[in-house]
């Protein structure tokens, strides 16, 4: 730990000196930019945000007034946004000591021109902005529904029955991608690092149930945060950083989802959403409170995966509040203050099936929690610094998995020993009910402070904004963990058994970070400019060395984005703007508690069992405990990204194309390890009675009345368990694009075409144990390199028809998948195939690297590895260890092009009502893809889906 702390301390000191070194640079005259923001009727707009050159910001007070101190003279760009109003951008010339800027905003309404209901590309970097109008039109149930507007995504029907995971640049779901996607709400990251909701990670990995019920995948342990806890109706806007994020954001690999909730005044609104599978009610209002505004919301939803099976249901209640104000408006150092809170209660049920009711079975997952955060900005005019941003938050939840299972045929002997040894055991040879509970109480604390120095450079609109910050995160779990009656375990007599485990014994995670960045914009001549965002982030995760095997993990993350604009109206007559952008960045996702502190592995072997009555009934169990299941070499998952893109605007048309390359290394998983088990086996004579176990011996009385000691022999067995490991990697290449053709006025319709080509190659990176069959006395170790390669090219043609005169907008989306291909691979690090063709040409084969021979082993110390000899492939005893594959196993599985049509409609009914309708695959297209080799089938089109929404305003 001392090494990590010293490196972090020295690095922070160096970065602090670099930051302090730029403070005296600014010598330009500074001014106060002040003014008033009103609506079209001249009424003040409260809590409107004003941002200058993406660096200086404030909000308006209850009179609509604002003031930004320390604005250097010259031209500056600004933008203003507020809940319920259309965003406004412009340029203002700063002159003298005070510059007046009065802004008049238009309310968002469908009778106004310029409605945008698709994701917008943000400058410099791969970022998609989904604003108020798009959120309103998409009719989401959760945050994950909004991800469909990101280029490369395909249509999926809104559902609350499945986990809501955010993935970036993915073809199919992937746990490491979801885990590496940071979700930030109002400046606060939603942490899932303290989630331990799994029954036995060393045995079942991430599942919360040992059996294949619909409830064993409701946990997000080892995955990303469940986005169903966020009310989609309380979202004002959302930004998705697909590429390289600023160094302000940490503990991630895939991307960032930034959610801004509603703040400011708004009319009382009530919504009713309904579809064949669910119903949702929401009400919210924003109102003045003292010198600020309060915005509150409440929603209730109920969803079923199948309307014929109401025993598979999901219920959600969320409540949100947000208070915003500004202190010291008009002073040299005004401070904005935002307080946001939320409460949620989610319940998954699986219990009302008639058959389950008859068997008295019940599975339930409950998640109740809340978040509270305070964040804001302080202007520091007259000081060495320009401003200070602060963010403090706390999150706590209680997740409970309750399972009542029926164990129809137990193996007979159970043990409650928590330590290794030989002990008397209980006999359980009748069917029974097992009740077990997994309780997790994850607690997360986050604090971040950022300071910046805004410096006006020589040209009238050139600037640099240097920013430094420090961040602290705490992740802990205070739940009781896995609990059950040891006399009625979830499984009985298994070779690997369950034991209760309290999460309160697991150390908390402490993560300290420091970052330094610079955002600059420079004029490079007529019509040319260059801007960049570059910085470095240092992070240290402090660990309990005694329990994790390491004292800490230290990472350095350099990142940079840049954009060079070389054509504008100033130097050509065709392009309004043409620029090239690029970036490079390294990001790390620290391992969570789930991977750092796995449970012990328990193995129970029956040494003796006699199912008699009274004196002829006895059981002895040998328990072996593996208590060193941690991986002291566990590393953070790391991503390295490169990007280059082209952005253009020609009249009413605009768009971009972006190429990216991503290398993801050290991704998390569980790796099998074997353990040789040795135990004493006791045998007695027929007709024995008065069985007893004392001092490590089984005694009995034979039929002649003689006291005897049971004969002994040694039993041997090999079992496996899972250890956390960095055993996966992903390589990604692709092209993302979007082109907005603008509106054709004659038909009031615009066309936006977006899509992507994704190429994703995934494979395991660790040699692994292979199970052949029960009773086989060799354990092969296979080479790493199994995986898949997937490609997909898709386009979305979004026809947006907006008719202001009737306050209506409808969108017809034609989704086309031009190319889709998947194949399995088995290759080495250089890409060479590890499989070879058999001598008769009927199959492919992969031989082990080595194996363990346990035949006739009398002592576990005698087990040794034997390198594989090619001649073993023809040996009847050893050839079973060779993996065999059909000739088509590594062939391409290509899907023919396919398309579907979706429709969304929104209509305002006066000033007090709005109706919306959506239909996915409304032509009821149905197509299954059949693998021509394996004949397996999979559905291409989502099921037809119809939903409606009614909103009332008061």
Residue ranges and their predicted role:
Residues 100-104, 143-146, 165-167, 183-184, ...:
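N-terminal periplasmic accessory domains that precede
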Residues 144, 148-211:
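Extracytoplasmic beta-strand/coil segments of soluble accessory domains associated
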Residues 526, 681-828:
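Gram-negative outer-membrane beta-barrel transporters
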Residues 188-241:
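Short acidic/polar hinge/loop motifs at secondary-structure boundaries
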Residues 327-345, 363-547:
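Face-selective signature of the C-terminal outer-membrane beta-barrel domain
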Residues 209-211, 664-666, 816-885, 895-898, ...:
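C-terminal beta-signal and adjacent terminal beta-strands/loops
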Residues 235, 271-302, 310-395:
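Transmembrane beta-barrel wall of Gram-negative outer-membrane proteins
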Residues 36-43, 48-51, 81-85, 95-136:
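Short, acidic, small-residue-rich periplasmic hinge/interaction motif at the N-terminus
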């Amino acid at each position: 730990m001392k090494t990590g702390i010293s490196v972090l301390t020295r690095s922070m000191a160096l970065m602090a000196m670099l930051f302090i070194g730029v403070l005296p640079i600014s010598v330009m005259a500074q001014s106060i930019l002040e003014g008033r923001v009103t609506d079209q009727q001249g009424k003040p707009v409260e809590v409107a945000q004003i941002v200058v050159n993406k660096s200086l910001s404030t909000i308006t007070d209850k009179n609509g007034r604002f003031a930004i101190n320390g604005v250097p003279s010259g031209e500056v760009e600004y933008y203003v946004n507020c809940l319920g109003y259309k965003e406004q951008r412009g340029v203002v010339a700063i002159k003298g000591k005070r510059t007046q800027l009065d802004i008049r905003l238009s309310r968002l309404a469908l009778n106004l021109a310029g409605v945008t209901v698709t994701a917008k590309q943000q400058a410099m970097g791969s970022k998609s902005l989904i604003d108020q109008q798009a959120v309103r039109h998409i009719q989401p149930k959760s945050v994950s529904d909004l991800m469909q507007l990101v280029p490369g995504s395909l249509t999926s029907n809104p559902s609350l029955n499945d986990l809501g995971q955010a993935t970036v640049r993915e073809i199919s779901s992937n746990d490491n991608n979801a885990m590496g996607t940071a979700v930030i709400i109002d400046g606060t990251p939603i942490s899932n690092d303290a989630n331990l909701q799994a029954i036995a990670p060393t045995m079942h990995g991430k599942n919360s149930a040992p059996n294949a019920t619909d409830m064993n995948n409701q946990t997000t342990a080892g995955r990303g945060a469940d986005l169903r806890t966020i009310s989609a109706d309380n979202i004002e806007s959302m930004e998705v950083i697909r590429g390289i994020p600023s160094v302000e954001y940490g503990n991630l690999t895939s991307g960032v989802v930034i959610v801004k909730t509603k703040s400011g005044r708004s009319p009382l609104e009530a919504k009713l959403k309904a579809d064949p599978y669910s119903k949702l009610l929401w009400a919210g209002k924003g109102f003045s409170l003292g010198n600020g505004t309060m915005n509150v919301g409440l929603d209730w939803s109920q969803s079923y995966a199948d309307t014929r099976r109401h025993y598979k249901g999901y219920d959600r209640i969320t409540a949100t509040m947000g208070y915003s104000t500004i202190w010291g408006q008009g002073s040299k150092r005004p401070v904005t203050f935002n307080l946001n809170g939320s409460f949620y209660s989610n319940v998954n049920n699986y219990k009302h099936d008639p058959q389950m009711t008859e068997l008295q079975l019940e599975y339930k997952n409950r998640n109740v929690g809340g978040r509270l955060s305070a964040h804001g900005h302080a202007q520091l005019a007259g000081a060495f610094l320009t401003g200070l941003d602060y963010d403090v938050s706390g999150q706590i939840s209680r997740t409970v998995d309750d399972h009542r299972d029926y164990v129809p045929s137990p193996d007979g002997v159970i043990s409650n020993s928590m330590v290794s040894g030989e002990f008397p055991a209980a006999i359980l040879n009748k069917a029974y009910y097992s009740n077990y509970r997994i309780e997790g109480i994850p607690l997360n604390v986050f604090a971040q402070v950022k300071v910046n120095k805004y410096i006006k450079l020589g040209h009238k609109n050139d600037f640099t904004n240097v920013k430094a910050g420090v961040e602290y995160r705490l992740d802990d779990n205070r739940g009781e963990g896995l609990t059950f009656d040891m006399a009625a375990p979830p499984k009985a007599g298994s070779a690997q058994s369950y034991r209760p485990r309290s999460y309160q014994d697991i150390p908390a995670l402490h993560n300290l970070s420091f970052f330094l960045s610079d955002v600059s914009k420079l004029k490079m001549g007529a019509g040319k400019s260059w801007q960049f965002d570059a910085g470095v982030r240092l992070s240290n995760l402090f660990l309990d060395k005694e329990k994790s095997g390491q004292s800490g993990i230290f990472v350095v993350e350099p990142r940079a984005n840049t954009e060079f604009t070389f054509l504008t109206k100033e130097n050509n007559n065709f392009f309004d703007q043409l620029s090239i952008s690029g970036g490079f960045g390294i990001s790390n996702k620290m391992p969570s508690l789930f991977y750092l502190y796995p449970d012990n592995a328990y193995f129970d072997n029956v040494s003796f069992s006699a199912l008699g009555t009274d004196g002829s009934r006895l059981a002895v169990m040998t328990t072996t405990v593996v208590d060193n299941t941690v991986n002291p070499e566990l590393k953070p998952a790391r991503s390295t990204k490169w990007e280059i893109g082209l952005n253009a605007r020609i009249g009413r048309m605009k768009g971009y194309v972006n190429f990216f390359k991503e290398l993801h290394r050290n991704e998390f998983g569980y790796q099998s390890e074997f353990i040789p088990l040795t135990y004493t086996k006791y045998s007695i004579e027929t007709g024995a009675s008065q069985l007893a176990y004392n001092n490590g011996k089984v005694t009995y009385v034979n039929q002649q009345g003689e006291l005897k000691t049971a004969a002994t022999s040694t039993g041997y067995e090999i079992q496996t368990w899972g250890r956390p490991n960095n055993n996966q990697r992903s390589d990604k290449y692709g092209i993302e694009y979007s082109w907005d053709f603008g509106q054709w006025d004659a038909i009031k319709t615009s066309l936006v075409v977006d899509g992507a080509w994704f190429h994703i190659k995934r494979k395991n990176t660790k040699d692994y144990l292979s199970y052949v069959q029960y009773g086989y006395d060799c354990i092969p170790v296979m080479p790493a390199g199994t995986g898949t390669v997937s490609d997909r090219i898709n386009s979305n043609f979004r026809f947006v028809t907006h008719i202001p005169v009737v306050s209506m907008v409808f969108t017809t989306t034609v989704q086309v998948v031009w190319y889709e291909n998947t194949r399995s691979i088995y290759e080495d690090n250089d890409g060479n195939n590890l499989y070879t063709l058999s001598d008769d040409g009927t199959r492919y084969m992969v031989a082990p690297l080595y194996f363990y021979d346990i035949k006739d082993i009398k002592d576990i110390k005698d087990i040794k590895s034997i390198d594989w000899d090619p001649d073993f492939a023809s040996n009847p005893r050893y050839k079973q260890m060779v993996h065999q594959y059909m000739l088509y196993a590594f062939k391409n599985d290509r899907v023919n092009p396919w398309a579907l049509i979706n429709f969304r409609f929104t209509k305002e009914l006066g000033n007090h009502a709005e109706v919306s309708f959506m239909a996915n695959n409304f032509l009821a297209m149905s197509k299954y893809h059949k693998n021509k080799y394996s004949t397996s089938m999979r559905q291409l089109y989502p099921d037809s889906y119809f939903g409606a929404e009614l909103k009332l305003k008061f």
